[in-house]
Amino acid sequence: NLTQSEVRKIVKQLENARLIQKDNTKASNNAFGAFAGQKQVTVQLQQIYLDWQRQQIFRELSSRFMRLSSTQKNNMDRTVVMADNPASARYQESAKIDLRLQELDQAGISDESASLVKKLEELNKLLDPTNEPRPKLALEKVKAELDPALEGALTDIKGSRLQSAAGNERRARGAMI
C-alpha cells in the first residue's frame, strides 16, 4: 500500500530539485529520484484501483445473488401454498394458470442465475485462483448445489411435483446466499 512517507519523500525530492538549480547534477538526480518515486506511486495507485474494482464486482455479484435468493424464496413460498391446496383444487383452471406462472418465474430465476454465473466464470478466468480463490469456490458451489437445485425445481414444477419443487427451490435459495 501507498504510505504518507513515500509521498513526502517524492515531494521533498521535487522541492530539492527545484531549490538546487546551480548544481545541475544534484538537481537532475533529485528530479530522477522523484520521477522514479512517482512512477512507483502511480503503479501502486493503479493496483489499489484494480483491487477496488474487483471488490466492487464481487459486491455487485453478491448483491444480485442476494436479490435473486429473495425472488427464489417468494417463488418457493407460492409453491408451498399451491402444494398445500387440496388435490381437487389443483385441477381447476386457476390452479393451472398459477402453476404455469410458477414455471415461468422459476425459468426466469434460472436464466438470471445463469447470467450471474457467466459473469463469475469470466471473473474466474481473469484472476489467479491462488491469489483470489473466491470465484473458483463460488463456481464449485454453483456446479454442486445451485445448478442441480434450479434444474430440479423447474423439472418438478413442470411435472406438478410441488413439494419436491419447493424443496429444490429451498436448496437453490440456500446456494445463492
Regions from the PLM with identified roles:
Residues 1-177:
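Mature extracytoplasmic or organellar-lumen-exposed domains after removal of signal/transit peptides
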